[in-house]
Amino acid sequence: INTVTAKADVAKMSLYNNFSSKGELVDAYIAARHQEWLDLYQKRLEKTKTAKEAILAVFDAYQDHAEFAYEKGFRGCGLLNAAAEFPANSSGRNAVRQHKEQVEAIVAEHLNRLLKDSQRVSYIASQLSFLLEGSMARAGLEGSSRQLQLARQMAEDVLDRECQHD
């Protein structure tokens, strides 16, 4: 709590008046980070014309997020880093899982416009999601968004390959 109040430059009572528990504070952090990413994605999405571009906008929004200036350098997905600190089945961990599921659902929604086979849509959405999250983990370890750029190119290759069959 002392670290949080010092970083936020607020009195402890202000923190206690706004959050009834540490869990509630963590939930607010996760919700804020999720909304931050959704806003980045929405800005990218507004510039797209095709379903393929909309899917790649998900990768671009992750790239944008990685490019933010971080005090201690980029260390990967803040939500996954936070989730690693939570016990299994905690509300914070579940909130992070829901965010990741929503990102995959966004990809699947756009894939539905490209592919007719719903099982294929589900499989490719999972594949792209794993590619996205794995590249974010590597980017965090390396402190560079280079892996996200490579993942975007790989995603584009997957989409080109899949869409020529449909």
Regions found by a protein language model. Give the residues of each.
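C-terminal peripheral helix-coil segments that are non-catalytic and often amphipathic
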Residues: D64, E101-R113, D117-S122, R138-D166
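Amphipathic alpha-helical segments used for helix-helix packing
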Residues: A69-S91
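Helix-turn-helix
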Residues: I1-A28
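Short, basic, alpha-helical segments at the C-terminal edge of helix-turn-helix-like DNA-binding modules
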Residues: A31-L38
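Amphipathic alpha-helical packing segments from all-alpha helical-bundle domains
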Residues: E71, N89-R113, S126
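Cytochrome P450 catalytic-core helices
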Residues: L132
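Hydrophobic alpha-helical connector segments
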Residues: A28, Q42-E71, A125-L128
